[in-house]
C-alpha cells in the first residue's frame, strides 16, 4: 500500500497492548497506522512517546479519525486499473467503521454488476451508508461478471470510503473512494477541530456553482467484471461507445465525448457503434490543480516511541502530505467556512481543449 505507517502490532501482542493501542488497531490488524500531531495547520510526525508513554493522552477526545484517499499516494485511478485492486471472496464478514473528516476525491466509483443469470453481485448498502460526498469524477460501471464470492473486498487491505463511514466491502450503486482510516493525536482535546459541517446534497445535484464544487459522472459498460479478461466500454450514449484504455484520463473522456457529439460520430442506427481511439492521440490531459494539492514527499524517519523497539527496528519510508499554498493572485473555489487545516477543498481548474487534425490542443 502507498501509506506506510510507523507502528505495527502483530497478533500475538494484542493482549499486552494498552487501551489506546487497542483502539488504534481496531481498524485492521494488518494496517500500519500513521500517527501525528496537528501543529500550525500541517500534519507532522511527532514522538508518540510524549503522548502515550508519559500519560499525556488524557482521553479519547484527543483522537480524531480521518479518511485518507489512496489516490493521494499516486495509485492508478483509471477504471481498468482500479478494479484490479478489488476481488470477490466468501466467508469473511464485512466490517464498518466511522471517521470524522476526509479529503476531497478526484476519482470515485459506483458499481452496478450482475451475474449472467441476472442476479445481483453486490449487496445493497445498509441503512445509514451514503455515497462519498465529494467526488470530482464518479466512474459509474454497469455490466456483468461471474462474481465468485459473497462480497467484493480490497485486495490490498484498504477501505472503501463512504459518507463518514468506511467499509471493507463494496455496496451496490453506492459511490465510494478508496482509502484508509487513520487517527490524528491532538496535544489536547479540541471540540472545534473539525468545525465545518459536510453539505448534504447528493452527488448528482451539484451543477449549481454555489454548492462549491462540481461532480461529473462518467459511465462505463463492463463484461467479465472481476476477471483477467474484463472488457470496458466508455458510454457516449446508449448506442455509442469507445473502447476504454488505461491511458484515458477523465478529462480526455469528457473531451472525447464532446468531440463525438459535435462531429456527428454517434450511432445513427439501432445498432451499437464502438469506436477505438488512435494510439497516436495524446491522452494525457489532466487537472494540474489536483496533483498540486496532493503533492507528497518521501522522507525517512524513525519511531522514537517506547513501543518502537517491540515492533519496528529500522526507519520506514512514509508519505507526508503537504498542502500547496496558493499564489496571492489565486483563490480556491467557493467553500464553506472551515478551520485552517490540511483537510481542504481542492481548487478545481481545468483545461479547455480542441481537436485539430487529429491532435488535441489544450490551453488553460
From Swiss-Prot:
Carbohydrate attachment residues: 40, 204, 228, 238, 257, 268
Signal peptide: 1-32
One of the protein's GO biological processes: monoatomic ion transmembrane transport
Keyword terms, alphabetized: Cleavage on pair of basic residues, Disulfide bond, Glycoprotein, Ion channel, Ion transport, Secreted, Signal, Transport, Viral ion channel
Pfam families in UniProt: Filo_glycop
MF terms in GO: channel activity
GO cellular component terms attached to this protein's record: extracellular region; host cell membrane
Transmembrane segments: none
Record-marked site positions (Cleavage): 324-325
The UniProt record lists the keyword Transport: yes
Positions of disulphide bridges: 108-135, 121-147
Sequence similarity: Belongs to the filoviruses glycoprotein family.
Protein name: Pre-small/secreted glycoprotein
Organism per entry: Zaire ebolavirus (strain Eckron-76)
Gene from which this protein is expressed: GP
Amino acid at each position: 500500500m502507498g501509506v506506510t505507517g510507523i507502528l505495527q502490532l502483530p497478533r500475538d501482542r494484542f493482549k499486552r497492548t494498552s487501551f489506546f493501542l487497542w483502539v488504534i488497531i481496531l481498524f485492521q490488524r494488518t494496517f500500519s497506522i500513521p500517527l501525528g500531531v496537528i501543529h500550525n495547520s500541517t500534519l507532522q510526525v511527532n514522538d508518540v512517546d510524549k503522548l502515550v508513554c508519559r500519560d499525556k493522552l488524557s482521553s479519547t477526545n484527543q483522537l480524531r479519525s480521518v479518511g485518507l484517499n489512496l489516490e493521494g499516494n499516486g495509485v492508478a485511478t483509471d477504471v481498468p486499473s482500479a478494479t484490479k485492486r478489488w476481488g470477490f471472496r466468501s466467508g469473511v464478514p464485512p466490517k464498518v467503521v466511522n471517521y470524522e473528516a476526509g479529503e476531497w476525491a478526484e476519482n470515485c466509483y459506483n458499481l452496478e454488476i450482475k451475474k449472467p443469470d441476472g442476479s445481483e453481485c453486490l449487496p445493497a448498502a445498509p441503512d445509514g451508508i451514503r455515497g462519498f460526498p465529494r467526488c470530482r469524477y464518479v466512474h459509474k460501471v454497469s455490466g456483468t461478471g461471474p462474481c465468485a464470492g459473497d462480497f467484493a473486498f480490497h485486495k490490498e487491505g484498504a477501505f472503501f470510503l463512504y459518507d463518514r463511514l468506511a467499509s471493507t466491502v463494496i455496496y451496490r450503486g453506492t459511490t465510494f473512494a478508496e482509502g484508509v482510516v487513520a487517527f490524528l493525536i491532538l496535544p489536547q482535546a479540541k471540540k472545534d477541530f473539525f468545525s465545518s459541517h459536510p453539505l448534504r446534497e447528493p452527488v448528482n445535484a451539484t451543477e449549481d456553482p454555489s454548492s462549491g464544487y462540481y461532480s461529473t459522472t462518467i459511465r462505463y459498460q463492463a463484461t467479465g467484471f472481476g476477471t483477467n479478461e474484463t472488457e470496458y466500454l466508455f458510454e457516449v450514449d446508449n448506442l455509442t461507445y469507445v473502447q476504454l484504455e488505461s491511458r484515458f484520463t477523465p478529462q480526455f473522456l469528457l473531451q472525447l465525448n464532446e468531440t463525438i457529439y459535435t462531429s456527428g460520430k454517434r450511432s445513427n442506427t439501432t445498432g451499437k457503434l464502438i469506436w477505438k481511439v488512435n494510439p497516436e492521440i495524446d491522452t494525457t490531459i489532466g487537472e494540474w490543480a489536483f496533483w498540486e494539492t496532493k503533492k507528497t514527499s518521501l522522507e525517512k524517519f524513525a519511531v522514537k516511541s517506547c513501543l518502537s523497539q517491540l515492533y519496528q527496528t529500522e526507519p520506514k519510508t512514509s508519505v507526508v502530505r503537504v498542502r500547496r499554498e496558493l499564489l496571492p493572485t489565486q483563490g480556491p473555489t467557493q467553500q464553506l467556512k472551515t478551520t485552517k487545516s490540511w483537510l481542504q477543498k481542492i481548487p478545481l481548474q481545468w483545461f479547455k481543449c480542441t481537436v485539430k487534425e487529429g491532435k488535441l490542443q489544450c490551453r488553460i
